Swiss-Prot record:
SUPFAM superfamilies: P-loop containing nucleoside triphosphate hydrolases
Family to which this protein belongs: Belongs to the Mrp/NBP35 ATP-binding proteins family.
Physiological role: Binds and transfers iron-sulfur (Fe-S) clusters to target apoproteins. Can hydrolyze ATP.
GO BP: iron-sulfur cluster assembly
Domain of life: Bacteria
Family annotation (PANTHER family): IRON-SULFUR PROTEIN NUBPL (PTHR42961:SF2)
Organism this protein belongs to: Rickettsia typhi (strain ATCC VR-144 / Wilmington)
Entries under CDD domains matching the protein: Mrp_NBP35
Known partners and oligomeric status: Homodimer.
Molecular function (Gene Ontology), one example: ATP-dependent FeS chaperone activity
Binding positions (ATP): G105, K106, G107, G108, V109, G110, K111, S112
Designated name of the protein: Iron-sulfur cluster carrier protein
Length: 318
């Protein structure tokens, strides 16, 4: 047993996962090797205890395949949870059934285009749909939908602009074209609250939120303050995009938001299977791989429906 090391343990249990997609390797710690005996801890915070016991037995079964191992000790640990009574209640958005975030780890991956496509496709399927352009530092939705007007207000509530039968609100409606938008984190979060909760939505089945890139204050504010139904993550084949999207996955999992799937955009820019790898590693569905289609840019510039060019298998994931 002198040659036994931690990597052997990690390798043996690398394919064991919880039902929520968490790999066992991600939640183990305190690996101890003493002679023929090995042991470690599993953090089961937020996990079902019966499932955790099944995972423990699977791990023991795999580790028994290591030559000469005698005793295997696996203990459960759990992080101290915050008293639910002390947690701030989350907001529901009036007249909205489901809220879906569209997010990315980095900018420039086509997130706003995908948000528009999802909304347009759902609308064609006879759902009532709205979009909040929450990318307040670079709002693109007004351009994609060809909107150049300022929304009206009635009794202090904003009336969303209707375009292609989709109810739309964006910070871009309230600033001059080509003007820089500069907000600190708290102010940015306050603006998102105004766009969401101070808009008079008309009986929406789906509200699609085009999020800013990254994992900053706006993301935390949304996750902590609103009842959300899931997030779709958009990425591209580059390695840097993969690194950033992993950070996003980590954020949403830590805060308990279901990740509905990954969309890989512009896949012919680089030949790779990065998203296939991410999908398998994190047990997240790969919704679609979208090639570079020059007509998409033209459709966005001319405010034409993107559904004329491609569709997504949304019924499986939303």
């Amino acid at each position: 047993m002198a040659n036994l090391h931690q990597q052997q343990i990690i390798d043996k249990i690398q394919n064991i996962t919880f039902k929520d997609g968490t790999f066992l390797n991600e939640v183990i710690s305190d690996i101890i090797i003493k002679g023929n005996n090995i042991g470690f801890s599993i953090d089961i915070s937020g996990k079902n205890k019966l499932e955790a016991e099944e995972i423990r037995l699977k791990a023991i079964n795999e580790l028994n395949n290591i030559k000469d191992v005698n005793n295997i000790t696996i203990v459960f640990t759990q992080k101290k949870t915050i008293d639910k009574k002390a947690q701030k209640p989350k907001h529901f958005v009036e007249n909205v059934k489901k809220i879906i975030l569209v997010a990315s780890g980095k900018g420039g991956v086509g997130k706003s285009t995908i948000s528009a496509l999802i909304a347009q496709q759902l609308s064609l399927e006879n759902y009532q749909v709205g979009i909040v352009d929450a990318d307040i530092y670079g709002p693109s939705i007004p351009h994609i939908f060809g909107i150049n007007e300022i929304p009206k207000t009635v009794e202090g509530r904003i009336i969303p602009i209707l375009a292609q039968n989709i109810q739309i609100i964006s910070i871009g409606f309230f600033v001059k074209a080509h003007s820089a938008i500069i907000y600190r984190g708290p102010m940015a979060s306050k603006i998102i609250y105004q766009l969401l909760s101070n808009t008079r939505w008309n009986n929406l089945d789906y509200l699609i939120i085009d999020m800013p890139p990254g994992t900053g204050d706006i993301h935390l504010s949304m996750l902590e303050n609103y009842h959300l139904d899931g997030v779709i993550v958009v990425t591209t084949p580059q390695k840097i995009s993969e690194i950033d999207v992993i950070r996003s996955i980590d954020l949403y999992r830590k805060l308990g938001l279901p990740i509905l799937g990954i969309i890989e955009n512009m896949i012919y820019m680089l030949e790779s299977d990065r998203c296939g790898h991410l999908s398998k590693k994190y047990n997240i569905p790969l919704i679609a791989k979208i090639p570079i289609i020059p007509q998409i840019a033209n459709a966005c510039d001319k405010s034409l429906p993107l559904t004329n060019l491609l569709t997504l298998p949304l019924e499986k994931y939303l």
